[in-house]
Regions:
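N-terminal cofactor/phosphate-binding cores enriched in small/glycine residues
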Residues: 4, 10-73, 86-87
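Extended, non-catalytic structural segments that build the interaction scaffolds
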Residues: 9-11, 141-142
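Acidic/polar loop patches that form or flank catalytic/metal-binding clefts of enzymes
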Residues: 34-36, 205-214, 243, 249-251
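Fe-S ferredoxin-like electron-transfer domains
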Residues: 51-54, 60-192, 197-198, 203-230
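Cofactor-/ligand-binding subdomain signature composed of acidic, glycine-rich
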Residues: 122, 243-279
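Catalytic and ligand-binding motifs that coordinate phosphates/metal ions
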Residues: 223-255
């Protein structure tokens, strides 16, 4: 394995030559020295969509996305600087003033670290308002929470499922994730694998069961436990993470580092857990 030496925040480190700056920094993180990311997925090729992970590289005129920029010999990287903090603050404020980030993990911490104030652009998010789309029994689409990170598009497309059901439609402020000709999900080629839900960072895509429990005020994530198991529907042996609340399975995910699934599941593995409930 060929390695590369570079300097990150004044400290020299050696990593594999194919590593990205984000990987060289230990991956996404929170706190004062963590690199924030919204559009990064461990098993999806980076799109550089959110621009939240930008860092400063000596000799580069512009800030570079840490999630996709590959390390180079003797590269000097600053993960925190006046330019970096300003850029991240602006991204957080732009997103926070136009998108509902209430369910986005870590965003409150990042807002505090970078002193971002989305309210200075107005108290109410100036987003494209539309009702939550509930056109099937398995998952809902709330585009008021969508940041156009492309992860669902890539998970549905060539990188994971190869169904190619959704893509980005429209332009500018009207850009949105859409099925072909914006047909209802049941009329599309969707196979309801739910892999788009797995990668969504903001809660724009959510299982119906979770959506209903949140609406009823009965979704208590802090009270949930997780159980690792193997899917019993077929012989592939997909790894499942069962989210359990009040002795009932309320959600199923799959770990991205699983050597078989890499986070992917089919409709049976992700949504077919009702048979296991004690009813």
């Amino acid at each position: 394995m060929t390695t590369v030496s570079l300097t990150i925040d004044g400290r020299q480190t050696t990593v594999d030559e194919n590593s990205t700056i984000l990987q060289a920094c230990g991956g996404p993180g929170t706190g004062d020295h963590g690199i924030p990311t919204l559009c990064y997925g461990e098993t999806i090729t980076p799109r550089n969509a959110c621009r939240l992970c930008v860092v400063e590289v000596e000799g580069s005129r512009v800030l570079v996305p840490a999630c996709s920029r590959v390390v180079e010999p003797d590269m000097i990287v600053l993960t925190r600087s006046e330019r970096v903090d300003h850029a991240r603050r602006m991204v957080l404020e732009f997103l926070g003033s136009s998108v509902d980030l209430s369910l986005t993990e870590h965003v409150a911490d990042w807002m505090s670290v970078y002193e971002a104030d989305p309210n200075r652009y107005g108290d109410e998010p100036a987003t494209v308002t539309e009702p939550v789309r509930i056109d099937n029994d398995l998952y809902v689409r709330d585009y008021a929470k969508c940041i156009l990170c492309y992860q669902c598009v890539d998970a549905c497309g060539a990188q994971w499922q190869n169904s190619f059901v959704i893509d980005i439609a429209g332009r500018g402020f009207g850009a949105r994730v859409s099925t072909e000709h914006d047909v209802p999900l049941p009329d599309s080629a969707c196979v309801y694998c739910g892999n788009c839900i797995q990668v969504c960072p903001t809660g724009a895509l959510m299982p119906v069961a979770e959506f209903d429990m949140r609406a009823a005020g009965t979704w208590h994530e802090s009270e949930q436990t997780v159980v690792e198991t193997i899917c019993g529907y077929c012989g592939v042996g997909c790894g499942l993470t069962l989210h359990v609340q009040d002795n009932s399975i309320v959600k199923v995910t799959s770990p991205p580092d699983n050597p078989i699934t890499h986070g992917n599941l089919c409709i049976k593995g992700r949504f077919g857990f009702q048979h296991a409930q004690n009813r």
